[in-house]
Regions:
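Conserved PLP-enzyme active-site core in the AAT-like
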Residues: 1-8, 13-278
Length: 278
């Protein structure tokens, strides 16, 4: 990976002149079945941009109560985008895994075009896998069900897919399964610096028009950088060499959970470890 970074062709990405960054953005967009992509310095920035593209100031974003967008992004969606958030319980039903999306619960909360009486719901954010849920995976059919309901209501979807790579590996589809997940959302963020092992960066994907808007917003937030090809090269290398290795991470996480449970019964449920978080 470091050799790829050192040898990467670079240019000025603010002017769209970095060939390695462009190649990464195009590749991730194609994998997720979207028109265009945008490299960002962090997953939080990718989420802020993705949500802001879908939610105008004063409109509402729905998400679960332990979602990264509402718990770990320092209030950025409200402070920087004027976005109102409303949440459903992360364990949406008794006994349900924390972070597992329940389309019935989400649909009951949506209030699109609410007029002068309630805040209008503009978008729903879902997270797959779910960080604070310990790597909970929402199965693809559930996301597809949610997508049908939100589409019928005229509500957009942002997918925080920081660990989406882990979800598709756990499902057994690998990179080939990404497009089906991408089709469940209007904007998707994926992280290169978690399980994939790149040093920096996330990619936001969406329509070409939305990504052009995001490029402007990224600069406004201080995320426009110059010779980003040295970072993008790491992402490209990770996509070529590290995705399949996530299965090994998952195996080790299960082994760690089993060992912890054996040493101190009740401290962790090994059956709940489906990806790489214990």
């Amino acid at each position: 990976m470091r050799r790829a970074m050192a040898e990467a062709p670079v240019g000025d990405d603010v002017y769209g002149e970095d060939p390695t960054t462009t190649a990464l953005e195009q590749r991730v967009a194609e994998l997720l079945g979207h028109e265009a992509g945008l490299l960002t310095p962090s997953g939080s920035m990718a989420n802020v941009l993705g949500v802001r593209l879908l939610v105008e100031p004063g409109q509402e974003l729905l998400c679960d109560s332990l979602a990264h967008v509402v718990r770990a992004e320092m209030g950025a969606h409200g402070a920087l985008g004027g976005v109102t958030t409303r949440t459903w319980p992360s364990a949406s039903r008794p006994g349900a895994p924390v972070g597992l999306v329940d389309p019935d619960v989400v649909e009951a909360l949506m209030t699109p075009d609410a007029g002068p009486y309630l805040v209008s719901t503009a978008a729903v954010a879902v997270e797959n896998t779910h960080n604070f849920g310990g790597g909970t995976i929402t199965p693809l059919p559930v996301l597809q069900d949610l997508r049908e309901r939100t589409r019928a209501a005229g509500v957009a979807v942002h997918l925080d897919g920081a660990r989406l790579w882990n979800a598709v590996v756990a499902e057994g589809t690998g990179l080939a399964g990404l497009a089906a997940h991408g089709a469940c959302a209007d904007t998707v963020s994926v992280c290169l610096s978690k399980g994939l092992g790149a040093p920096v960066g996330s990619v936001l994907v969406g329509s070409a028009e939305r990504v052009e808007r995001a490029r402007v917003l990224r600069k406004r937030l201080g995320g426009g950088m110059r010779q980003t090809g040295v970072l993008a090269a790491a992402g490209l290398h990770a996509l070529d060499h590290h995705v399949d290795r996530l299965a090994e991470d998952h195996r080790r996480a299960r082994e760690l959970a089993a060992a912890c449970a054996a040493a101190r019964p009740g401290c962790v449920d090994p059956a709940a470890v489906r990806s790489n978080i214990v």
